[in-house]
Amino acid sequence: MRSPPGAVAALASVAAQLATAALVPRDAAAPTTAAMPLPFPAQVGIDDSNLATCANANWPPPSSPVGEVISAQLPDADLQAALGEVDPARIRAIVDKLVGFGTRHTLSTQTDPTRGIGAARDWIAEEMRGYAATAGGRMEVTVPGYVQGVASRISFPVKISNVVATLKGDKDPDRVYVVSGHYDSRVTDVMNYEADAPGANDDASGVALAMELARIFATRRPAATIVFTAVAGEEQGLYGSAFMAQTYRNASVNVEGVLNNDIIGSSTGSRGEKDPHTVRVFCQGGSPAGESKERAETRASIGGENDSPARELGRFIAEVGGNAFTDMKVALVYRLDRYLRGGDHRSFLDAGYGSAVRFTEPNEDFNHQHQDVRNATDGTVLGDLAEFVDYDYVARVAKVNLAAAWSLANAPPQVRNVTVDTSTLSNDSGLSWAKIAGAGAALVKGYEVVWRPTTASLWTHQLYVGDVASFRVPLTKDNVIFGVRSVGLNGYKSPATMPFPG
């Protein structure tokens, strides 16, 4: 294209001035008169008649050429029946009983039959044994523990015991899922083991949830094993859960998911805000513990930091747990936990069990956590008292947990060794995976490919590909995150697994 005549003249003028300026020595005196501004060249004309406008841009693509928009995994008749058995009155009775032990501080008495953590432990175990009696020998209740020596927040040697109810899977018993809460409590001074520490919300609510699910599941036969546990030592430093997680790790137990429930008892926050139909699920991202340096670097290079095992579990919980049958919305929070706080799911993550998440109420009221029971000068009642627990809300959170545990335990195992072909440049994406083997193979109907835009939080599309070990999708891997999940003969689906280059 020829430049307009005006532009040529202007450019020539600029060039002449620059040439003159170049002849002036660097140390020459500044001119005594103000320099004239250089004239700008005339604008070059552009024919934009064939260019699309922003309004016509097509990103992200409005639809996929293959597959279908993903849909929630709604409960079947059996799961609906189980959800209908969750009882707020039973949950309330458990919380009231635990509060009635006065304190459940880890360092409190273990010999008094009516007060302290020992009495609480014995009562929880006895209740769990009652549930086990209805399970036809498939549920075993144990109270494993160890003596913790003097350590952080432990001023003298003390026995730390967990109550563990294990419901053996009917078809794939070596695959294990854990539902947990902690039964110890505290007040303002974390070392004060004498004062009343009701711990109604933190965390009798979580223990009540785990116990209620143990009761409901005891009469049923999930395909995989589910463990319902009340752990101790959380407030002093996650001692009980660390002992449990390491015990499982040492025995090479295949824990495929941990649902930790801690502070799930209130729908009202410190400013009076109410959100009775939402529960937060905290899911850590990045590389899970034990991932090799090379694999972690690959994860970072492909944008896989948002597809950790914990976040895949979180997406699964949102898909199966947020619906009209639970009357809840699952709000995923992409971090390990809240600021300045911690929970027992971390013990499992640290032990190398990457699929561990935490359930917590949406709005917390710190007047009713870690507080001495008292009245403030303005009349505010302080303390973690049972009167501040919303039992209907706890029951709904229990339904989300029940839907998740049921769906996990009755689906086939999660797919392993998923790869995407990067051997050549292509706008198609070749995916491969290892077909489910062992006891879980009998549960499998086939496999499903899922995907989402790289900026999306949840899976957006799905494509059932059959009982195969590879599939080529007519989508570019550069623009989406893929996942592969197993589909059961009963319709239940596993959490997805993101592919690595292979």
From Swiss-Prot:
Binding of Zn(2+) 2, residues: 202, 235
Known cofactor(s): Zn(2+)
The record's free-text note on cofactor binding: Binds 2 Zn(2+) ions per subunit.
Positions glycosylated per UniProt: 250, 375, 417, 427
GO cellular component: extracellular region
Sequence ranges assigned to domain Fibronectin type-III in this UniProt record: 414-502
PANTHER family noted in UniProt: METALLOPEPTIDASE M28 FAMILY MEMBER, PEPTIDASE M28 DOMAIN-CONTAINING PROTEIN
The protein's name in its UniProt record: Probable zinc metalloprotease MGG_02107
Organism: Pyricularia oryzae (strain 70-15 / ATCC MYA-4617 / FGSC 8958)
